[in-house]
Amino acid sequence: MTVRRFTLLLLLAALLSSAAGPALGEGMPAWEYPLEPEILDDYDQYITLANRTHLLSGDYVPADLVNTTCKKASDAGKPQLRQAANDAINAMFAAAQEDGYTLYLKSAYRSYKTQKTMYNTRLERLGRDDGLVSYPGASDHQTGLGVDILNLEWTKKDGMNKNFAATGEAQWMAAHCQEFGFILRYMEDKEEQTGIKFEPWHFRYVGPEAAAYIMENHLSLEEFTEEWQAYINAWEAAGGNFRQLIIERSKVNAVTVIDVSDDGEEEVSIFY
């Protein structure tokens, strides 16, 4: 069976090569960015930026929102997250528990309408924008990937502030979040880049590969976005075609072997 499978894959690879014309990436400079191009293509919108200069539309609602199944603060209501973020937060909470830290979800997805109400209410009360409530469309929470996480003591407090960073839970999350695809979204020394004050409780799901790169290089999501966009621009200026690269790679990756027959025989299918 192994020989048959290998032979079929070689045959299909040859057919794909002849049908596609030039070899994968032929004539293009080598792709040397540390992350795969598919991650930057962001089909799943995991690295989508939401801030004052990258506003989400008023009707933007993630398609795969689910009710969260992790431990929640008593006043959290019925928070929702995108499916991947929900799976990841459950894994992170379980790992934290094993290390002796109990985490509580305080806030997750927030609609544009809710964010607008919160922003206007605070603006009317203070008479100014103090930066503590994001402008409508600029909230990380609207992506369905941003979360506020606290320990039990802090869920009982009226408000959140940077002193939460001194807790064991905050320190554990800052050290381990990337293992589950999360980043510390608003770092203490990145206020100039993010436009948001330090929030040791706010984490953002971006996927494990991007999270590892961002956290290991101590980047804000803004800096990461600027960096990879600049790389693609320079790569294309040198003769690359990012869209064509994605298309060609998707054709190669579309060759899969699946078992669909009653007798266990393998069949090869190609999906474009």
For every predicted segment, state its role:
Residues 3-25:
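Sec-dependent N-terminal signal peptides of Gram-positive bacterial secreted proteins and lipoproteins
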Residues 24-108, 112-272:
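Extracytoplasmic cell-surface/polysaccharide-interacting catalytic and binding patches
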